[in-house]
């Protein structure tokens, strides 16, 4: 496994300074992501990427694996956040950005309108050039929230199933759930008329069996999910759920092949993979531009290019 480099470099410094100036949070920092330096720093021909966390740094839920702060009554939303986020990202000149958020069950719409406003402003300020992925909550099963996000004009709708069905209650907050998450993903695909790519993520090493992982992959595909990532759960602090198993690279490779055989459009599977990691960025961007009728090659040429990009993405996690 590749040793992760320490955060640093001009691009890393620029992004961190701008985030502090505009009082923005990132899931990269809050969740203590091991890939922070690599993604923020860019390099090796990759786009520097920071996953912006909307609606503050305090979540109303308390999942057993997550290092983000929790509270029953988080601070009010910052009404300037959508404008600040869109301003910062537009200034960085990125081609692809990931938005995520805390859960805000204290808000009537779960924060859907706030997220949607950010997406619309991003599209406006970049004249539609920017590709936007949003990793969003389940909105407590309210499909109105899902529709609000879809209609904002994003390109990739992401929501994480996190773990297998049997372990949902042990891993996630009691307000989350297997059926609710699958319904959210299915609704996003349906409301968009199939236009959106949908994406989800599974943590391994929580005590799941191989058969349960395969069943989870099948359930995601049955609900129209196009992209899946699989990564190793790492315990953020001693207060959090313990790691049940460190899954081998060979097992991750086997799950990747199984997912491909099930028909996922893109799979990133490896110990250091996280749901917002850049491993899929090249491939997903190519697919989205192809759907737009953009600059990509067609037919066999496009398939060959996408295959090369998948290999590059997998190499980033090796």
Curated annotation (Swiss-Prot):
> Which Gene3D superfamilies does the record cross-reference, listed alphabetically?
Aldolase class I (3.20.20.70)
Lineage, top-rank taxon, reads Eukaryota
Q: Which GO terms describe its cellular component?
A: mitochondrion
Name of the featured protein: Lipoyl synthase, mitochondrial
Q: Composition bias, kind Low complexity: at what positions?
A: 302-318
PANTHER family named among the record's database cross-references: LIPOYL SYNTHASE, LIPOYL SYNTHASE, MITOCHONDRIAL
Name the SMART domains for this protein. Elp3
Catalytic reaction annotation: [[Fe-S] cluster scaffold protein carrying a second [4Fe-4S](2+) cluster] + N(6)-octanoyl-L-lysyl-[protein] + 2 oxidized [2Fe-2S]-[ferredoxin] + 2 S-adenosyl-L-methionine + 4 H(+) = [[Fe-S] cluster scaffold protein] + N(6)-[(R)-dihydrolipoyl]-L-lysyl-[protein] + 4 Fe(3+) + 2 hydrogen sulfide + 2 5'-deoxyadenosine + 2 L-methionine + 2 reduced [2Fe-2S]-[ferredoxin]
Chief location bin: mitochondrion
Q: Which organism is it from?
A: Chlamydomonas reinhardtii
| Gene name for this UniProt entry | LIP1
Which residues bind [4Fe-4S] cluster 2 per the record?
59, 63, 66
The pathway to which it is assigned is: Protein modification; protein lipoylation via endogenous pathway; protein N(6)-(lipoyl)lysine from octanoyl-[acyl-carrier-protein]: step 2/2
Q: Cite the cofactor comment.
A: Binds 2 [4Fe-4S] clusters per subunit. One cluster is coordinated with 3 cysteines and an exchangeable S-adenosyl-L-methionine.
| One GO MF term | 4 iron, 4 sulfur cluster binding
Localization recorded for this chain is: Mitochondrion
Q: What keywords are assigned to this protein? A: 4Fe-4S, Iron, Iron-sulfur, Metal-binding, Mitochondrion, S-adenosyl-L-methionine, Transferase, Transit peptide
- A Pfam family (short name) is Radical_SAM
**Could you say which enzyme class this protein belongs to?**
transferase
Cofactor (UniProt): [4Fe-4S] cluster
